[in-house]
Amino acid sequence: MPQISKEALIEQIKDGIIVSCQALPHEPLYTEAGGVIPLLVKAAEQGGAVGIRANSVRDIKEIKEVTKLPIIGIIKRDYPPQEPFITATMKEVDELAELDIEVIALDCTKRERYDGLEIQEFIRQVKEKYPNQLLMADTSIFEEGLAAVEAGIDFVGTTLSGYTSYSPKVDGPDFELIKKLCDAGVDVIAEGKIHTPEQAKQILEYGVRGIVVGGAITRPKEITERFVASLK
C-alpha cells in the first residue's frame, strides 16, 4: 500500500478539491465495458483536482492507470435489509486494501450493520488488520464523527448527512455539522451536496482537511436537472 503518512496526505489535498468520479449501474455514464470513469478523472486532474474519490475495484484499477493523484476508495454493495452500503463489511475493505490506495472510506453511521458489529468494533478490526491504511469515516451526524475518531479513524467525512433517517434534510451542504466537527478538532473531509464553488469556499474557511465534490462536477444528468428545475 502507498506509504503515505496522514500528514503528507493532508499537505497534498490542502486547500483543494477532491473530485468524486462514480457511475452506478442505473446511471447514464455507467458502462459494462468500463473506460468512462478514467476520462472523468483525467478531466478533473486537468482542471486542478488534488484527489479522486472512486467506487469499485474495476474503476479504481482503471483510474490508477491514468493518474497519480491520491485516491479515496469505496465499494458500494447492498446488504439488505440493512441500510449501510458503502464499504459495509470487511470483505469490501479487503478488496480495497489490495489496490494500494491512499484512503479507504467506510460507512460509520450508527445504523444496524450486516455483520452485526458496532461501528467502533468494526473500525478497530480494520485498524488491526491494516494498521498502515488511512481510513475515512462516512458519517451523518456529529456523534458518529466523534465515535469514529475515538475508534481510531483518520478522517471524518460528512458524506451521509441527509441520507440517514435521523440527519437533517437540506438541499446543500450540512454547514453546521462541518463547522462543529472542525471546531471539535476533528480532521474533516467535507462531502455531500456541495453544489457551488461558493459553498466550497465557505467550507474551506471552517478549517477542513479536504473537500469532496461529486455530482456538481461529474454527474451531467444531475447538473442538467438543476438547470431545468431553476427555470420552472
From Swiss-Prot:
InterPro entries: Aldolase_TIM, NanE, RibuloseP-bd_barrel
Annotated family: Belongs to the NanE family.
Protein name: Putative N-acetylmannosamine-6-phosphate 2-epimerase 2
One MF term in the entry's GO annotations: N-acylglucosamine-6-phosphate 2-epimerase activity
Keyword set, alphabetical order: Carbohydrate metabolism, Isomerase
Gene Ontology annotations of biological process type: carbohydrate metabolic process; N-acetylmannosamine catabolic process; N-acetylneuraminate catabolic process
Native species: Streptococcus pneumoniae serotype 4 (strain ATCC BAA-334 / TIGR4)
EC number: 5.1.3.9
Keyword hit for Transmembrane: no
Cited Pfam families: NanE
Keyword Transmembrane annotated: no
Pathway: Amino-sugar metabolism; N-acetylneuraminate degradation; D-fructose 6-phosphate from N-acetylneuraminate: step 3/5
Regions annotated as coiled coil: none
Enzymatic reactions: an N-acyl-D-glucosamine 6-phosphate = an N-acyl-D-mannosamine 6-phosphate
UniProt superkingdom: Bacteria
Functional summary from the UniProt entry: Converts N-acetylmannosamine-6-phosphate (ManNAc-6-P) to N-acetylglucosamine-6-phosphate (GlcNAc-6-P).
Gene3D superfamilies: Aldolase class I (3.20.20.70)
Listed PANTHER family: N-ACETYLMANNOSAMINE-6-PHOSPHATE 2-EPIMERASE-RELATED (PTHR36204:SF1)
NCBIfam families: PRK01130.1
Alphabetical list of SUPFAM superfamilies matching this protein: Ribulose-phoshate binding barrel
One GO location term (cellular component): cytosol
